[in-house]
């Protein structure tokens, strides 16, 4: 089930994340998250959805003895969100200063500076591995940066905005933060937040509890359920943040 919360930052800007209840159950394949609210008609908008920051790892592949491709090392990422979505009225670089982007970690360039990578020998190597990490995340539909995808309507003398995000099944349970920024003259002048809490339900929740408390029983039930359903239940439980 997805629980929704909204916070109004001021009388001008509001943010509400709103969609049907989502249960991560046995047949869950993702959903949609819409974000809407009221905004200043003279301001550009940036909408960001992120998970809490965490540690993630990306495995390095290389040839061993000049013959076989194998894992030859691991790049560790610190302070990185498992999910990062960004939507804006225009390209972020065109409407927000570098300092403002860095302060609120808006955009891939700011995220790259914010994230710590180990081991890397210099900024050039960091940029290469961060780029590979973003490609992996985008392929998994966990990272997305897009512009021009916010629509506006006028009602009762107010400007209403709306955008829609495809919510990937790979996103793990937890609390996600939706932040809406109002931007003028390349500075953030207002912001509003919503929280989206995603939870497991039904058999998935029970099996997840078994996986934690009784791995042997979980393994047997997972195989039986997979044979009955035609796909591996284990796929449902894989963490969206893990990179292989």
Predicted regions: what they are:
Residues 29-35:
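Structural beta-strand segments of beta-rich domains
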Residues 11-28:
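N-terminal edge beta-strand
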Residues 35-68:
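N-terminal, post-signal-peptide region of Sec/Tat-exported proteins
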Residues 214-244:
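Juxtamembrane interface at the cytosolic side of transmembrane helices
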Residues 6-8:
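N-terminal signal peptide c-region/cleavage motif recognized by signal peptidases
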Residues 161, 174-180:
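A short tyrosine-centered beta-strand micro-motif
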Residues 187-220:
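Short, aromatic-rich amphipathic segments at membrane interfaces
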Residues 70-170:
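Membrane-proximal low-complexity regions enriched in glycine and acidic/polar residues
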């Amino acid at each position: 089930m997805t629980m929704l919360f909204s916070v109004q930052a001021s009388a001008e800007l509001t943010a509400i994340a709103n969609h049907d209840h989502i249960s991560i159950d046995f047949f869950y394949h993702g959903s949609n998250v819409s974000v809407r609210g009221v905004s200043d008609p003279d301001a550009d908008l940036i909408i960001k959805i992120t998970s809490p920051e965490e540690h993630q790892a990306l495995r390095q592949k290389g040839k061993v003895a000049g013959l076989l491709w194998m894992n030859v090392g691991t790049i560790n990422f610190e302070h990185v969100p498992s999910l990062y979505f960004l939507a804006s009225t225009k390209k972020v670089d065109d409407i927000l200063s570098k300092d403002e982007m860095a302060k609120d970690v808006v955009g891939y360039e700011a995220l790259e500076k914010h994230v710590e990578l180990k081991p890397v020998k210099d900024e050039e190597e960091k940029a290469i591995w961060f780029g590979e990490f973003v490609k992996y995340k985008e392929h998994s539909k966990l990272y997305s940066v897009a512009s021009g995808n916010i629509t506006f309507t006028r009602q009762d003398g107010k400007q209403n905005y709306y955008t829609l995000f495809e919510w990937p099944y790979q996103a793990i349970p937890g609390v996600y933060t939706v932040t809406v920024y109002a931007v003028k003259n390349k500075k953030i002048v207002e912001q509003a937040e919503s929280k989206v809490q995603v939870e497991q339900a039904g058999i998935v929740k029970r099996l997840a509890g078994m996986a934690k408390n009784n791995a042997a029983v979980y393994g047997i039930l997972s195989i039986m359920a997979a044979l009955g359903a035609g796909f591996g239940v284990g796929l449902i439980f894989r963490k969206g943040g893990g990179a292989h």
